[in-house]
Amino acid sequence: MTYGKKNIVAGLFFLAAFMIYGFVLISLRDFAPGKALWIADYATGTHFESRLAHVHGNLFAFLNIMIGYLILHLPVSAFSAKWVSWLGLTGMLMPIGIVAEFALGASPVFVLAGGIAIVASMTWLGFAVWRAKLV
């Protein structure tokens, strides 16, 4: 699979997964036995972290779809395409890390690594497009 296509495929599956996760959050708000407590904790703790993961998961899915599309359609060097692609995919560790933090008590290292990777990917892609010979 080519660089770019990997990002589009991963982004679409990631988007689907975090959309399903959004439906789980809706069911917790509307139908779960402890829904009053869930609603009361809207801006704190697990509820806040779960919403943070949902929004970043969908954002990073979209960013990977965009990364893939731009890599495939703009004259970005192969070296830049490879690194931008892998950094974008690595960025998806951030929302996964947020879920792992509150659900499994995992270290925030995945959140930090993913955040750094997605910022690096966007910055590198910006410079690569800037340097590209566009007509």
Regions found by a protein language model. Name each.
Residues T2-H54, N58-V135:
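Polytopic transmembrane helical bundles with strong interfacial aromatic enrichment
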